[in-house]
């Protein structure tokens, strides 16, 4: 399942769809907002790139609830509801996962960025919407930045907001991402920002390369995957180093880019995992 209303193509879906077809499965790629689609005709519905859900969250959650009654939804509804609002980070922390220090602010509330920084002991932060993807609406800010306070006020007028401690290592070392399938590490990626930026997404000039995760990183990713609120088909866990230890910055289990073109073995893992959910074979 994908979306039609997005300027950038999703390179993962064609690779996965072709690999499933080559393994003997019937595959249709559909836009979740297409009301003519009969989702009950699918034994399994795999969420891949519904990237426009951030602009239609209530509609998307209603679609997921309906579809989960008609088809086997992966990832399941409980994960979709949990993962589409970044407050899931606080839940992960409560379950024992190390996260980048985060404060969640409710939409419509009034908050002082300087007071938050003072209370937390932070010199710099990243302010971002609680419902967003691809770095949308994110802004780095330092203490005493009046423009950043205005940005926070604008975001709060629209909805809930995350304020996260800025991790300086991102500028030099970038982020690491670990892609897991059924709890098994498929591959890892190192994502680095463009010079002078902190955002690692390609929309902002970032670059991504396949990398070998350390044993500690793989173990952390596996442990965090097990903390999801329901069994999951896949997830991408984004981490950064703080004080020599990995901390979760985000966890994507609804619409993550997986860079399957860099990791054909992970594509095979996904095909096998989806196949295990399909009985008997179709097509």
What are these regions (language model features)?
Residues 4-106:
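Conserved N-proximal alpha/beta basic substrate-recognition cap immediately N-terminal to
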Residues 42-47, 177-180, 245-257:
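A short beta-strand motif that forms the metal-chelation/ATP-contact edge
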Residues 50, 130, 166-167, 179, ...:
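Anionic group-transfer/hydrolysis microenvironments
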Residues 64-69, 77-173, 215-218:
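Active-site nucleotide/adenylate-binding loops and adjacent lid/helix of ATP-dependent enzymes
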Residues 136, 140-229, 240, 247:
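Phosphate-binding site of ATP-dependent enzymes
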């Amino acid at each position: 399942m994908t979306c039609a209303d997005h300027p950038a193509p999703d390179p993962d879906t064609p690779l996965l769809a072709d690999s499933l077809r080559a393994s003997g499965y019937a595959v249709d790629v559909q836009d979740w907002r297409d009301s003519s689609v009969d989702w009950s005709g699918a034994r399994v519905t795999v969420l891949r790139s519904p990237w426009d859900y951030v602009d239609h969250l209530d509609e998307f959650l209603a679609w997921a609830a309906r579809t989960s009654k008609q088809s086997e939804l992966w990832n399941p509804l409980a994960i979709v509801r949990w993962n589409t609002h970044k407050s899931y980070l606080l839940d992960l922390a409560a379950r024992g996962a190390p996260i980048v220090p985060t404060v969640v602010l409710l939409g419509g509330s009034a908050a002082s960025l300087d007071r938050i920084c003072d209370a937390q002991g932070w010199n710099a932060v990243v302010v971002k919407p609680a419902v967003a993807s691809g770095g949308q609406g994110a802004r780095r800010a330092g203490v005493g930045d009046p423009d950043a306070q205005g940005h926070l006020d604008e975001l709060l007028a629209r909805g809930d907001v995350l304020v996260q401690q800025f991790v300086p290592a991102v500028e030099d070392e970038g982020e690491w991402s670990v892609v897991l399938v059924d709890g098994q590490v498929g591959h890892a990626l190192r994502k680095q920002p463009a010079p002078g930026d902190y955002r690692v997404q390609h929309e902002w000039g970032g670059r991504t390369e396949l990398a070998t995760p350390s044993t500690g990183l793989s173990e952390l990713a596996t442990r965090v995957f097990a903390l999801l609120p329901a069994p999951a088909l896949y997830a991408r866990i984004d981490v950064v180093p703080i004080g020599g230890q990995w901390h979760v910055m985000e966890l994507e289990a609804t619409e993550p880019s997986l860079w399957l073109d860099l990791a054909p073995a992970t594509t095979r893992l996904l095909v096998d995992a989806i196949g295990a959910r399909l009985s008997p074979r179709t097509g």
